[in-house]
């Protein structure tokens, strides 16, 4: 059990302390405009001096009046930025939500195409299973849908571009003529 400090209660039996006694004010006779006497002025000055002398606060939290405590709490101005009760959404979609009737158009994001070297891109196109399957169907005499035909044309055009860029000639092109031209332009002294 916690200890409680004994407090002095003023009763009829106990003698009164000086601090408990109220100074006797001489009764003023006359109207409001009466000038106070020298004795009254001295008594008033003594009271004010006593108040100035003991202007410190009493020790401990026990001595605080609840009424004064409430007044102090009311006067305290809090910073409105601290302790906000407003809920903050964690998802960005809820913050930028359009008003009713308005539509935010989605921003078209360009697809990132990794830049491959021409040799690697050509190899990937030549080894493309879908393209090879479609080319086999064309050779077999089947007709392709417009979408598939467009895909085949784009791939073949890109293969031609890459081959010209790399300086590669198609093997099917006039093998006999190319060999003859190479033989005629070749220097025979080179093989001695």
Swiss-Prot record:
Top-level division of the source organism's lineage: Bacteria
Biased composition regions of type Basic and acidic residues, renumbered to the chain: 9-25, 37-48, 65-80
GO molecular function, a single term: GTPase activator activity
GO terms under biological process: ribosome biogenesis
Keywords, sorted A to Z: GTPase activation, Ribosome biogenesis
Keyword check for Cytoplasm: no
Transmembrane segments: none
The keyword Protein transport appears for this protein: no
Disordered: annotated span: 1-80
Pfam family, one: YihI
InterPro entries registered for this protein in UniProt: YihI
Physiological role: A GTPase-activating protein (GAP) that modifies Der/EngA GTPase function. May play a role in ribosome biogenesis.
Subunit (UniProt): Interacts with Der.
Listed NCBIfam families: PRK05244.1-1 (NF003560)
Record-stated family: Belongs to the YihI family.
Name of this protein: Der GTPase-activating protein YihI
Protein source organism: Actinobacillus pleuropneumoniae serotype 7 (strain AP76)
Lineage: Bacteria, Pseudomonadati, Pseudomonadota, Gammaproteobacteria, Pasteurellales
């Amino acid at each position: 059990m916690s200890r409680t400090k004994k407090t002095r209660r003023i009763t009829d039996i106990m003698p009164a302390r000086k601090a408990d006694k109220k100074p006797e004010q001489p009764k003023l006779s006359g109207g409001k405009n009466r000038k106070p006497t020298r004795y009254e002025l001295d008594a008033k000055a003594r009271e004010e001096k006593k108040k100035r002398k003991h202007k410190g606060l009493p020790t401990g939290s026990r001595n605080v009046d609840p009424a004064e405590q409430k007044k102090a709490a009311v006067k305290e101005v809090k910073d409105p930025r601290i302790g906000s009760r407003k809920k903050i959404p964690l998802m960005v979609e809820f913050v930028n939500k359009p008003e009713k009737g308005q539509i935010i158009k989605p921003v078209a994001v360009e697809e990132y195409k990794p830049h491959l070297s021409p040799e690697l891109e050509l190899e990937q196109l030549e080894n493309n299973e879908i393209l090879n399957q479609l080319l086999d169907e064309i050779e077999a005499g089947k007709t392709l849908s417009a979408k598939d035909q467009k895909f085949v044309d784009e791939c073949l055009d890109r293969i031609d571009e890459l081959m010209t860029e790399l300086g590669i000639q198609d093997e099917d092109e006039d093998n006999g003529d190319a060999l003859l031209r190479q033989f005629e332009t070749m220097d025979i002294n080179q093989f001695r």
